[in-house]
Curated annotation (Swiss-Prot):
This is V-type ATP synthase beta chain. Produces ATP from ADP in the presence of a proton gradient across the membrane. The V-type beta chain is a regulatory subunit. It comes from Coprothermobacter proteolyticus (strain ATCC 35245 / DSM 5265 / OCM 4 / BT). Keywords: ATP synthesis, Hydrogen ion transport, Ion transport, Transport. Belongs to the ATPase alpha/beta chains family. One of its GO terms (molecular function) is ATP binding. The lineage of its organism: Bacteria, Pseudomonadati, Coprothermobacterota, Coprothermobacteria, Coprothermobacterales. The keyword Ribosomal protein does not apply. GO terms for biological process: proton motive force-driven plasma membrane ATP synthesis. It holds the Pfam family ATP-synt_ab_N.
C-alpha cells in the first residue's frame, strides 16, 4: 500500500528522517517529490516514531517543508528474462548500454529467497577457467564460492575479465552464463570491462552490472544483490550454470562503513559495522546448487586487501564464509609474471569434489600434489641460497630451484588471451615433473607415471 507523508524532520548527508511513519518496512522503496522531480530512496531503519531513508540520487536541494515522501510498500525488484543476457546495467538495474529495457518475464526481489540448507546439494563438477594456476592446482567447482585476494596495483581486473571470457563447463550440452558485478570502479575500468567482454564475444552470454565510483553509496550496496537476483533466475529457472564475479568487495564494505557512520552506529573492528559478517554472508551464501534443479551459481568475489593485510576485517571475514582463496602475489608481479597467483598461499577447499576420473582426468590430484610439494621445496632452497649462497645447496636443491623458476615462468605465467584446456595444463605439469628424478615423484602412483610421463618424453 502506498502512503504519502510531508513530515520530513531532518536531512543529514544522504539520509532523510521522516516522522510519523510507524509501519515502514526495512528495505522499502521511497519516492521523494520536489517541484516535479522524483528521487528514490530505501528505508534503512524504522521505529515507532520515524523512518530513516537513504536517497539514491543524493539529497542536494531537498527541503523538509516542500518535499513529499511516498512509501511504496515494496522493496527493490529487478525485471528478469533471458533478454538480460548480452546487456549492461548500472548498479540499480537500469540499462547502461543505450538500449531499451529488455522484455520482462517477471520481477524478482533483489534480496532473493534464502536457500533451505536441507535442499542444498554439495558443490561438484569442474569449471574450466583456462588459467593453469587455478584449473591445475586450485580448481573451481560448480556451486563453490572462491574469492580472489588481491592488492592495490595488482592485475585483478584483467584476471576477472579473462576468467569471465574463458570460463566454461566441459559438457557442451549444458548452458553456461556469466553475471559480472563491479562496485566503485572508475569510468576507465568500466570501459575496460565492457570492451573486454565485447572483444572476446563473452558479452553474448553475460550480464554486466557496473556501479561507478561517483555513483551513490547506497547503490553500491544494491549492485551485488541485483547481480545475484539475475544469477538466481538464470540458474534455477532457466537451468544455466552461472558464474557470478563480484569486484571489488572492498569498495562494497567501505560503502557499508560509510552508511553505518551516517546512521551513527557503534563501530566494530576498524570502524566497520558489527554486522558486516552477516551482511557479507547474505551475499556469499547465495552461491550453490539446489536439489532437483539443473542450474548452479558459482561465485568469485574479488577484493583488494588494504595495505596487503590479510588480517584486515574484509579478507578475514570473507575467508570464514567462503571455501578457499586465490592469492595474488606482489613478488610474482615484480617478476612480470601474469597472472601473479601464489599457488602455495592459495587453496580451493572443494577441489577434490571436481577433479579426477569422470571430471577432469584420473592423474589430476596426484600431479597437483606433486607440483605443490616440488614447488615448496624449490622455494625453500631458493631462500636458503639467498642466505647462505649457492655453494650451500646440494645438486638436488639446485634442481628444485630450477623447477620452481620454470613452474613460475611456464605453468603459472600465461598470456592474457591464452586459454588453456585442462589437458594442456596437466601436460605442462608433467613436462615440468620430468626435470626431477623418478625417485622424487613420491606423490604419484607408478601407473600414472608409466601412462603419462612417456607421452611427455616422446
Amino acid at each position: 500500500m502506498i502512503r504519502e507523508f510531508r513530515s520530513i524532520s531532518e536531512v543529514n548527508g544522504p539520509l532523510v528522517f521522516v516522522e510519523g511513519v510507524s509501519d515502514a518496512a526495512y528495505g522499502e522503496l521511497v519516492e521523494f517529490q520536489l517541484n516535479g522531480e522524483i528521487r528514490h530512496g530505501q528505508v534503512l531503519e524504522t521505529t515507532d516514531r520515524f523512518s530513516l531513508v537513504q536517497v539514491f540520487e543524493g539529497t542536494q536541494g531537498l527541503t523538509p517543508k516542500t518535499t513529499t515522501a511516498r512509501f511504496l510498500g515494496r522493496g527493490l525488484t529487478f525485471g528478469v528474462s533471458e533478454g538480460i543476457l548480452g546487456r549492461v546495467f548500472d548498479g540499480l538495474g537500469e540499462p547502461l548500454d543505450g538500449k531499451p529495457q529488455p522484455f520482462v518475464d517477471k520481477y524478482v526481489d533483489i534480496n532473493g529467497a534464502p536457500m533451505n540448507p536441507v535442499s542444498r546439494e554439495y558443490p561438484a563438477e569442474f569449471i574450466q577457467t583456462g588459467i593453469s594456476a587455478i584449473d591445475g592446482m586450485n580448481t573451481l567447482v560448480r556451486g563453490q564460492k572462491l574469492p580472489i585476494f588481491s592488492g592495490s596495483g595488482l592485475p585483478h581486473a584483467r584476471l576477472a575479465a579473462q576468467i569471465a571470457s574463458q570460463a566454461k563447463v566441459l559438457s557442451s550440452e549444458e548452458k553456461f552464463a556469466v553475471v559480472f558485478a563491479a562496485m566503485g570502479i572508475t569510468f576507465e575500468e568500466a570501459n575496460f570491462f565492457i570492451q573486454s567482454f565485447q572483444k572476446t564475444g563473452a558479452i553474448e552470454r553475460s550480464v554486466l552490472f557496473l556501479n561507478l565510483a561517483d555513483d551513490p553509496t547506497i547503490e553500491r550496496i544494491a549492485t551485488p544483490r541485483f547481480a545475484l537476483a539475475a544469477a538466481e533466475y538464470l540458474a534455477f529457472e532457466k537451468d544455466m550454470h552461472v558464474l557470478a564475479i563480484l569486484t571489488d568487495m572492498t569498495n562494497y564494505c567501505e560503502a557499508l562503513r560509510e552508511i553505518s557512520a551516517a546512521r551513527r552506529e557503534v563501530p566494530g573492528r576498524r570502524g566497520y559495522p558489527g554486522y558486516m559478517y552477516t551482511d557479507l554472508a547474505s551475499i556469499y551464501e547465495r552461491a550453490g546448487r539446489i536439489k532437483g534443479k539443473k542450474g548452479s551459481i558459482t561465485q568469485i568475489p574479488i577484493l583488494t586487501m588494504p595495505e596487503d593485510d590479510r588480517t584486515h576485517p574484509i579478507p578475514d571475514l570473507t575467508g570464514y564464509i567462503t571455501e578457499g582463496q586465490i592469492f595474488l602475489s606482489r613478488d610474482l608481479q615484480h617478476k612480470n609474471i601474469y597472472p601473479p597467483i601464489d599457488v602455495l598461499q592459495s587453496l580451493s577447499r572443494l577441489m577434490q569434489r571436481g577433479i579426477g576420473e569422470g571430471h577432469t582426468r584420473e592423474d589430476h590430484s596426484a600431479v597437483s600434489n606433486q607440483l605443490y610439494a616440488a614447488y615448496a621445496r624449490g622455494k625453500e632452497a631458493r631462500e636458503l641460497e639467498i642466505v647462505l649462497g649457492e655453494a650451500a645447496l646440494t645438486d638436488l636443491d639446485r634442481l628444485y630451484v630450477k623447477f620452481a623458476d620454470r613452474l613460475e615462468s611456464e605453468f603459472i605465467a600465461q598470456g592474457e588471451d591464452e586459454n588453456r584446456t585442462i589437458e594442456e595444463t596437466l601436460a605442462i605439469g608433467w613436462r615440468l615433473l620430468r626435470m626431477l628424478p623418478r625417485s622424487e615423484l613420491k606423490r604419484i602412483r607408478d601407473e600414472y607415471i608409466n601412462k603419462y610421463l612417456p607421452k611427455v618424453e616422446s
